[in-house]
């Protein structure tokens, strides 16, 4: 019964739109014309170039906000040894051997205090809140299970 009313209502709206002379937005004649004969879709900006989606060989992918100080606005409060720097080459696909999980393991092995200083380093050096929550869980899991 409800479905029938919804379908009938949809037909009524479609008929009203057809009768009012409304245009479809997907038609090419509705594009706004610009001076010089072009449209918004065809306008060329000589100073702007779109990236082709490829990176140079040997460069790491850095997620925006994945590392404190990545934008250059604030440096980390305390520097970590080079082997404990946060990774910059995560593929963000959720793989089981994630570089962030390895990073959490290295923090635990380095500090060996039950995870307190590892959690503090995590809070200080990782900017992404979702990633922090995941790594907090990993560190707590490792400290509880002894893993």
From Swiss-Prot:
Question: What name goes with this protein?
Answer: Oxidoreductase-like domain-containing protein 1
Highest taxon of the source? Eukaryota
- InterPro entries for the chain: Oxidoreductase-like_N (IPR019180), OXLD1 (IPR039251)
State the organism named in the record: Homo sapiens (Human)
- Provide ranges: composition bias, Basic and acidic residues: 52-63
Give the Oxidoreductase-like domain ranges.
Answer: 81-108
Disordered as annotated region, ranges: 36-82
Instruction: Give the CC-aspect GO terms.
Output: mitochondrion
């Amino acid at each position: 019964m409800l479905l029938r009313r919804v379908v009938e209502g949809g037909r009524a709206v479609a008929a009203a739109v057809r009768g009012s002379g409304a245009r479809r937005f997907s038609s090419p004649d509705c594009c706004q014309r610009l001076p010089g004969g072009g449209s918004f879709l065809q306008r060329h900006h000589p100073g702007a170039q779109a990236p082709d989606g490829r990176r140079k060989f040997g460069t790491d992918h850095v997620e925006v906000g994945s590392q404190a100080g990545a934008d250059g606005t604030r440096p980390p409060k305390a520097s970590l040894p080079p082997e404990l720097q946060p990774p910059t080459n995560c593929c963000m696909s959720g793989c089981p051997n994630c570089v962030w999980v390895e990073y959490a393991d290295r923090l635990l092995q380095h500090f060996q205090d039950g995870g307190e200083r590892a959690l503090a380093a995590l809070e200080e050096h990782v900017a992404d809140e979702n990633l922090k929550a995941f790594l907090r869980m990993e560190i707590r899991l490792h400290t509880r299970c002894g893993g």
